[in-house]
């Protein structure tokens, strides 16, 4: 009995210790978000005083604090009512990200179905080529894409940002893994009933792969929402910049606006993660399959 009590104590001890460590790590990760949310309810002068030193008659005094002493909605009112440029950047990011997600899901489903369920010459070579392209840093493709879009007259167009995302190879790789896990017996049974490949894809494969496709949606949206290099390289008009670029261009005279825009920028990703967190974890598992 003594040994059992010792074992139970050790298990409880390590369990409590692991929870404490996870709590500390979670707080470290969430600390910038907490600063940003609290800072969005501060005025400009309070932000400067809170995150820096103020000079008084007695010398340099640090007035650092997180909770607003004089909470205000002025930053939010300025964003929503005073200057529409801030919200315009938000909707530009939404438009680009949604277009990329829809296009990538469509392309990935058709391509993944072909790679997963068709046998053709050099199939493995094509799949390995997809993996190689997926491993290339985005910076490597910027110059070739710029030259192509310049020839097509798409520079300073949203298409120059959307098209590379739509034809990204990560979605093809992920969906190929998802479709490969579906038994071929379902496809053979559908063929016996007279279904063509399009019907098989739409009525059997995709309904059986909702979790994998949902994971692609959230991973693709997050990647598109946070992209910086492509808009900087392909879009020249400042007014067309998405939120990710716009946030880095807000100067220190509008720190209250910067905090508010930062809060707005994390809302779509937070909502997606809230509803599709299980699908995202499943997608990571699929991406690690061999």
What are these regions (language model features)?
Residues 6-290:
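A structural signal for multi-pass alpha-helical bundles of membrane permease subunits
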Residues 1-4:
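Short, Lys/Arg-enriched N-terminal segments with co-localized hydrophobic residues
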């Amino acid at each position: 009995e003594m040994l059992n009590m010792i074992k139970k104590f050790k298990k409880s001890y390590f369990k409590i210790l692991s929870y404490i460590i996870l709590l500390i790590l979670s707080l470290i990760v969430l600390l910038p978000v907490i600063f940003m949310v609290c800072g969005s309810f501060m005025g400009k002068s309070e932000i400067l005083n809170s995150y820096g030193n103020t000079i008084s008659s007695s010398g340099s005094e640090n007035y650092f604090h997180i909770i607003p002493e004089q909470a205000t909605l002025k930053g939010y009112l300025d964003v929503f009512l005073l200057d529409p440029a801030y919200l315009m950047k938000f909707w530009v990011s939404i438009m680009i990200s949604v277009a990329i997600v829809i296009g990538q899901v469509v392309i990935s489903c058709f391509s993944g179905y072909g790679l997963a369920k068709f046998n053709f010459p050099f199939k493995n070579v094509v799949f390995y080529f997809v993996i190689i392209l997926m491993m290339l840093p985005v910076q490597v493709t910027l110059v070739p894409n710029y030259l192509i879009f310049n020839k097509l007259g798409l520079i300073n167009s949203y298409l120059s940002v959307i098209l590379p995302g739509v034809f990204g190879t990560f979605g093809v790789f992920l969906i190929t893994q998802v479709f490969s896990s579906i038994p071929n017996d379902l496809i053979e049974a559908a063929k016996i009933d007279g279904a063509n490949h399009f019907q098989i894809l739409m009525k059997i494969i995709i309904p059986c792969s909702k979790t994998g496709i949902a994971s692609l949606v959230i991973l693709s949206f997050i990647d598109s929402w946070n992209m910086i290099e492509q808009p900087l390289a392909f879009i020249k008009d400042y007014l067309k910049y998405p939120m990710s670029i716009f946030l880095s261009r807000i100067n220190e005279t509008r720190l209250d606006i910067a905090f508010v825009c930062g809060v707005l920028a994390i809302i779509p990703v937070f909502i997606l993660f809230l509803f599709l967190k299980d699908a995202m974890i499943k997608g990571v598992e699929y991406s690690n399959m061999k």
